């Protein structure tokens, strides 16, 4: 299970949606980020690991 989490403030993240697959969670985060010009991240609920971060519609690549 994967969470889509929105950044409301520099130190405040709010869980918004849950998805069964990482791909669907990523597409949702990407779409919401482009539409709202906000930062979203996808987190794996099993390992509590961040799988991706999307800032203003652009993926962050590390």
Can you name each region flagged by the protein language model?
Residues 30-62:
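Short, mixed-charge low-complexity intrinsically disordered segments
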Residues 1-15, 41-45, 56:
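Short aromatic-glycine-(Arg/Gly/Cys) micro-motifs in beta-strand/loop hairpins
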Residues 11-27, 32:
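A short, exposed loop/beta-hairpin motif centered on an aromatic-Gly-Thr core
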């Amino acid at each position: 299970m994967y969470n889509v989490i929105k950044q409301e403030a520099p130190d405040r993240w709010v869980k918004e949606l849950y998805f069964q697959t990482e791909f669907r969670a990523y597409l949702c985060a990407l779409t919401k980020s482009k539409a709202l010009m906000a930062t979203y991240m996808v987190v794996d609920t099993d390992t509590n690991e961040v799988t991706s971060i999307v800032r203003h519609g652009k993926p962050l690549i590390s």
